[in-house]
Design a protein with these regions (language model features):
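Feature captures the catalytic ectodomains and active-site-proximal regions of enzymes
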Residues: 1-287
C-alpha cells in the first residue's frame, strides 16, 4: 500500500489506467489475506488473538486507503464534469458489437459480480494451462446492478428504462428462455444457458450444445454469496469462482472444441469485512 505513491491524479482516465495496472492489487491482496486468515482461525490456533488483532488492523488500513482513493476519485469526477466519456474505456453496452465474431464459434461466460481483481487472478490461473488469456476493462453502465448491466451484454438495438426495468429492444428479458429467444434474433442457432446446466449435462447433449455458433453461459456464484449474512461468504465464493471457471474454460477448449471464449461481468462489488456505516455512504445527488 505504501508503495502506491500519490492517490491524487489528474483525470478519470489516469485513475482507470492506474487501477487496472496497480491499484487493483490493494483489493486483491486484501481478499487473499482475509482468505488466509479464515483458514487459520477455523483450526485450533495458539496465536488466534494475535491474528485477530492483525486482521483488525488490516481492515482499518484497507478502509482508510480505499476511502482516500474514493474521495480523490470523486473530487476528480466533480472537477471534470463529463467524466463518463473521458475514461478511455469501451462501454459495456457495446460489448456484443465489439466482441462478436461470426466467423468463429464463440462462448460468452457472464459471471455475475466478477470484479476486476478477481478476473486478474483468474487470468493468471488460465495462463498456467497454456491458454492464451488476455484481460481488458470495460466501463459498466450506471447504476451497476444486475438487472441493468446483464441485459446490456446481449446484442440489442435499444436499451430503455421502463420504470425500474431495463427493456432490451422493447422487451423485458429476465429468464434464460427469454434471453435465448432474443439472442436468436441476432445469431441463428445461438442459445443462453446456466453454468449448472452445462456442468450437470450429459456428454451427448453438451456436445450438441457447443456445436452452436454462440452460447451465453450465466454464472451467479459470487453475486449469490453477496446476499449472505456471513462476511466471509463472498471471499469464499471468489475462490470457488476462480476454480470453477478455470475448469469450465478448460473443458470448453479440450472437450467441447471451443477455442474462442469470452468471460465478462455485469458488475463488480464493494467489500470490506467490517460493516458499512452510514457515514461511509455518499449522497447520490449530482450523480
Amino acid at each position: 500500500v505504501r508503495g502506491l505513491g500519490t492517490l491524487k491524479l489528474n483525470s478519470t482516465k489516469e485513475y482507470v489506467e492506474k487501477y487496472t495496472e496497480e491499484f487493483y492489487l490493494v483489493d486483491l491482496y486484501y481478499r487473499r489475506t482475509l482468505e488466509a486468515y479464515h483458514e487459520l482461525i477455523t483450526k485450533e490456533n495458539p496465536i488466534e488473538q494475535t491474528l485477530s488483532d492483525a486482521k483488525r488492523q488490516l481492515d482499518l488500513e484497507y478502509a482508510k486507503i480505499t476511502n482516500v482513493l474514493n474521495l480523490e476519485w470523486l473530487t476528480c469526477v466533480e472537477e471534470k464534469g463529463a467524466w463518463f466519456t473521458e475514461t478511455g474505456l469501451k462501454r459495456q453496452e457495446d460489448f456484443y458489437k465489439n466482441e462478436s465474431d461470426t466467423s468463429v464459434k464463440q462462448v460468452v461466460i457472464v459471471c455475475d459480480a466478477l470484479r476486476y481483481e478477481v478476473a486478474k487472478e483468474l487470468m493468471q490461473e488460465l495462463a498456467k494451462e497454456k491458454h492464451i488469456a488476455t484481460i481488458d476493462a470495460y466501463q459498466a453502465m450506471l447504476p451497476t446492478e444486475t438487472k441493468y448491466c446483464k441485459s446490456a451484454l446481449l446484442p440489442h438495438h435499444s436499451l430503455e428504462l421502463n420504470g425500474t426495468d431495463m427493456m432490451v429492444d422493447g422487451t423485458l428479458l429476465t429468464t434464460t428462455e427469454q434471453r435465448t429467444a432474443h439472442l436468436g434474433k441476432y445469431r441463428e442457432g445461438a442459445i443462453c444457458t446456466r453454468y449448472e446446466d452445462v456442468m450437470n449435462g450429459d456428454a451427448q447433449s453438451m456436445r450438441e450444445l457447443f456445436k452452436r455458433p454462440l452460447v451465453y453461459i450465466f454464472y451467479d456464484t459470487i453475486d449469490e454469496a453477496g446476499h449472505s449474512q456471513s462476511p466471509f461468504e463472498v471471499i469464499s465464493a471468489c475462490r470457488k469462482a476462480i476454480e470453477q471457471l478455470t475448469v469450465l474454460v478448460k473443458r470448453l477448449h479440450a472437450t467441447w472444441n471451443v477455442t474462442n471464449v469470452l468471460l465478462t461481468a455485469d458488475h463488480g462489488f464493494l467489500y470490506t469485512y467490517e460493516e458499512f456505516r452510514e457515514d461511509d455512504k455518499v449522497a447520490q445527488e449530482g450523480f
